A protein has these predicted regions:
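C-terminal helical "lid" subdomain and adjoining coupling/linker elements of P-loop NTPases
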Residues: 39-40
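Terminal, membrane-proximal amphipathic helices
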Residues: 1-33, 45-160
Length: 160
């Protein structure tokens, strides 16, 4: 039987996740200079989905944990926030919510040199901001599950 995760372990997982944010943000920046229209959006969506799966796995927020956590009314809003945006549709809604910033990143990259630099910086910033928000949501859900004596199995490993 699984034991409750110690708060120190959850904080260590969160710090480990923060260290990996840079990798995803750099990939987002590199994708920002992708010259093929439409492909950059698909790559950004795939990158977000991969990052979310990695972060959830580290906190032990698997599909089995999701089913278990959805039975607790106090956790349902946070469970929806963590799991419902972790779909292609959820990521597309998120990218659209960036609206003007995402459109600006997409169009400015066609300006030689300077535009590509601006697009890369915007891609880095957007991915970094999103990743940090998602880590906090996963951390909060794992802490709330712990506070309510709900056991989940944290893998505490990186998904390649």
């Amino acid at each position: 039987m699984a034991e409750l995760m110690h708060l120190g372990k959850l904080e260590a997982i969160r710090e480990d996740c923060y260290k990996s944010v840079n990798r995803y943000a750099i990939l987002g920046a590199a994708n920002a200079i992708n010259p093929i229209p439409g492909l950059d959006i698909s790559v950004d969506a795939g990158l977000c989905l991969r990052m979310m799966a990695d972060m959830r796995a580290r906190f032990g927020l698997s599909k089995e944990a999701e089913e278990k956590l959805r039975h607790y009314d106090v956790l349902v809003p946070l469970v929806k926030k963590v799991f419902d945006f972790a779909t292609k549709q959820g990521v597309m809604i998120l990218l659209k919510s960036f609206g003007k910033r995402y459109l600006g990143k997409t169009t400015v990259k066609y300006v030689p040199f300077i535009g590509q630099g601006i697009a890369a910086a915007a891609g880095y910033g957007m991915m970094r901001w999103f990743a940090r928000q998602y880590i906090e949501d996963c951390y909060e859900l794992a802490c709330r599950a712990r506070d309510n004596a709900i056991t989940i199995e944290a893998e505490a490993k990186v998904v390649p």
